[in-house]
Amino acid sequence: MKKMMAVLVATGLSASLLCSCGQKAAMEGTTGNGSSAETKKAEEKKEGKEVTLKVFDSMAYGIESYDELIKKFEEQHPGVKVEIQHAANDGNTILQSRVNSGDIPDVFLNEPGAGAKLYYEYSYDWSKDKDLLSKFNEDALNLTKTDEGAIYGLPWTYETMALIYNKDVFDKAGIKELPNSVEELGEICKTLKSNGVQPISLPGKEKWVLGQLATHFIMDKSLDAEGTVEALKSGKKTFKDLPHWDNFFKFLDLVKEYDGDKAVETGWEPAENAVATGEAAMLHMGDWAQANFTKMGPDTKLAFMPVPVGTAAEDNTILSSVGWVFQVYKDSPNLELAKEYCEYVLCSEDGAKWMTEGVDAVPANNTTELQPTGDLPQDAQKYIKAGKTNGWIHTICDTTYSDTVGPLIQGYLLGEYSKEDVTQGFEDYFKNLK
């Protein structure tokens, strides 16, 4: 998900007439008090009331096509106005503030894991909506499934992250092999620099990017994501025990050498633009950015480079998970409409077109044959099918992860913190993780 912008955008999308009673039949996966919901709609139609559905998310990609999708939903639901707030920077803080003030959105998005769990007590349990649940891949649904069997969120799309490189730039520089160590990556950087290309454009201004980057070097593949986090929380492992942690600082030293202080000044959009236009060769990002890359450089050929965290190909990491889950406020006055909205966005053909064309991502549903066309999601599928991906650590951590570790990494890049300072900061974070 990722996903982050430096602005808060609120858009209200409206239609004019009244809510159609016949729409429910088309949404066969919707359950609940159908007759009472239809009666309410009929009464509102007589009274000329407009229903406002409040939606909150932290998206930064595919926004324009999402707005078009919402307009279609409104057209199919006369009398319904979807009021959506895109809070792509500090989304967790803004959503928490709304919840604390009693202004809870009807539908809200969170990253699966710690982010979504914060709102389970407010969330509708989908576990009895069997027809709807059958439309999603089981592995994706399990991300919000509790030990008791409750399901508090519906999955959006799969997202994969690693280093992303411009294939044309690599070809022009004569680079034919991807690196299997930080040292080999350093040699590639030298070659790129000698060809007049900035080797790495790291969005170091973004704490979330830095936090995600660090997880590649935290990952212990023998434990996968959950096992690694649990071992660090319990004290069974320390950062000195992690097989590739020291190489994280070798990687950051490359960034310091080839990107300098500029790294902590660069946001996600300028970094993506630099790689899309060939000004830079690599950055750390996910396939959620494919639509932006396509817009910035329509003919640019991109691919994933598994992060060379160790000394051999089998050590390399590429991390994949579901980016966002849709949660519905269980006490929403528009509960059935909110459920219909989620099903429409996530399972309809219109929704599938948005996910595969507007965002260029792989849907977590099993109801469409549509697939993304971009280089990155297609490349990601190869790694996923080959079993060469690991899960996400940052979403298992609590929502303070990026805000805690991001400044530590920025401080190292600026020469303000030592390797020992940063490592101690990470140690303290995981020891205090609940």
Predicted regions mapped to residue ranges:
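Extracytoplasmic/periplasmic substrate-recognition and gating elements
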Residues: 71-76, 81, 149-150, 173, ...
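Extracytoplasmic/periplasmic substrate-binding proteins
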Residues: 56, 115, 250-333
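Extracytoplasmic "Venus flytrap"/periplasmic binding protein-like
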Residues: 72-139, 168-180, 281-282, 303, ...
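Glycine-centered hinge/linker elements that transmit conformational signals in sensory
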Residues: 191, 233-264
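Periplasmic solute-binding protein
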Residues: 118-122, 141-178, 197, 204-233, ...
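C-terminal capping/gating helix-and-loop segments adjacent to ligand/active sites or protein-protein/ligand interfaces
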Residues: 83, 232, 320, 358-369, ...
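Hinge/lid segment of periplasmic solute-binding proteins
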Residues: 111-164, 186, 192, 213, ...
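Short, low-complexity disordered leader/linker segments with a strong preference
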Residues: 1-53, 75, 428-434
